[in-house]
């Protein structure tokens, strides 16, 4: 997740440390030993520029969202085919109250807390670090443990989606009767924007909270024997993306692959930052969840509002976060309907992120439970929804 943050830390850090460049003194002149690598980023649809890694972190520290498209320039090029997916018919109302209500009773705050305590115990989950590799290994191990405990090994799978950097993404798949797919996502990486390779980044809220929220939903959904047994019409996937903080790198790689394969993805929901309510309370506003309304699919977003009204005990508020603010943007660029729900109105969200102070102590597990209820309701409703009916929707704002 990307936010506008200002800090005096930058002024206190030597430029060589922030940039990672090394120089030598030669008769008063600084001589740079190596030309830094360049990356192609997209700041808004069609607006691109080449930057160094130092430039990337400078942009992030100044609140600028972007997609690093250096290795994913083909993402979205097949949208002439996938644009037909924009005309997806979402339900008019929720119809699985009995089943979702029974399952929701199995969602626990304790489970999310235990998983988040483990996830934040890694010094950082920076995608280029060995800690990031280790944390992604733990995520896959935990998901496989959930599958085994549910006795679902014969039908449900989990695997790494490898990248050119150490940290892998993780994909869990619950097959349905068709390959029509509903995806729930979160990003597992964290970052310290000042010295990513050195300083700690516990990433409790960004996005440890989303990671363990959808992990808890996955755990609970496997208690539905009909879903595990393949009775649902649609396939369900849970994604834990690597390298969101580097410019949506992991999710872009996955959705570029899905686009090339012609995968039939009808809906993708991103859960990025689900635990901070203090900002809302300090603003004198009622606790709520923030439904993102820009650069998302309007039909899916409208149905998510209905899901929140049906299954959550707190209301929704509309809010905006800009272009490429989280991994749902990768799905949208591939032509797949996507949406994003965050912990609050954007202006009241967590400001402790991207440093050493993104800690569990600032989070509300009661609030995370509301996100879990919403996610469970959405995924169960859509797992059983007949997407074969036709409807004309407004296209995503891309």
From Swiss-Prot:
It comes from the Eukaryota. Disulfide bonds join 321-325. GO terms for biological process: proteolysis. Keywords: Aminopeptidase, Disulfide bond, Glycoprotein, Hydrolase, Metal-binding, Protease, Secreted, Signal, Zinc, Zymogen. Monomer. Extracellular aminopeptidase that allows assimilation of proteinaceous substrates. This is Leucine aminopeptidase 1.
């Amino acid at each position: 997740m990307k936010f506008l943050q200002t800090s005096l830390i930058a002024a206190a850090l030597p430029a060589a440390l922030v940039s990672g460049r090394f120089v030598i003194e030669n008769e008063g002149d600084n001589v740079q030993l190596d030309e830094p690598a360049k990356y192609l980023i997209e700041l808004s649809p069609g607006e691109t520029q080449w930057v160094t890694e130092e430039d990337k972190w400078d942009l992030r520290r100044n609140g600028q969202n972007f997609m690093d498209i250096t290795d994913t320039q083909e993402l979205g090029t097949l949208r002439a085919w996938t644009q037909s997916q924009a005309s997806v018919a979402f339900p008019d109302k929720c119809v699985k109250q009995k089943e979702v209500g029974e399952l929701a009773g199995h969602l626990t705050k304790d489970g999310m807390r235990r998983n988040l305590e483990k996830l934040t115990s890694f010094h950082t989950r920076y995608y280029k670090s060995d800690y990031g590799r280790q944390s992604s290994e733990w995520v896959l191990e935990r998901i496989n443990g959930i599958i085994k405990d549910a006795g679902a090994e014969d039908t449900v799978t989990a695997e790494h989606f490898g990248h050119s950097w150490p940290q892998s993404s993780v994909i869990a798949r619950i097959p349905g009767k068709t390959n029509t797919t509903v995806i729930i996502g979160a990003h597992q990486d964290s970052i310290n924007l000042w010295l990513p390779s050195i300083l700690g980044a516990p990433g409790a809220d960004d996005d440890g909270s989303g990671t363990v929220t959808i992990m808890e939903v996955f755990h609970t959904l496997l208690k539905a024997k009909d879903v595990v047994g393949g009775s649902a019409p649609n396939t369900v996937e849970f994604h834990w993306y690597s390298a969101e903080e580097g410019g949506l790198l992991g999710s872009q790689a996955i959705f570029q692959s899905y686009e090339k394969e012609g995968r039939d993805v009808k809906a993708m929901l991103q859960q990025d930052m689900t635990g901070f309510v203090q900002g809302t309370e300090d603003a004198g506003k009622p606790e709520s969840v923030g439904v993102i309304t820009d650069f998302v699919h309007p039909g899916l977003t409208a149905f998510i509002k209905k899901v929140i009204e049906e299954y959550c005990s707190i209301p929704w508020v509309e809010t905006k976060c800009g272009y490429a603010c989280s991994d749902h943007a990768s799905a949208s660029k591939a032509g797949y309907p996507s949406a994003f729900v965050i912990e609050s109105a954007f202006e009241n969200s967590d400001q402790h992120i991207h440093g050493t102070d993104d800690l569990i102590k600032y989070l509300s597990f009661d609030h995370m439970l509301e996100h879990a209820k919403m996610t469970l309701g959405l995924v169960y409703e859509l797992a059983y929804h007949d997407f074969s009916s036709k409807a004309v929707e407004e296209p995503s704002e891309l």
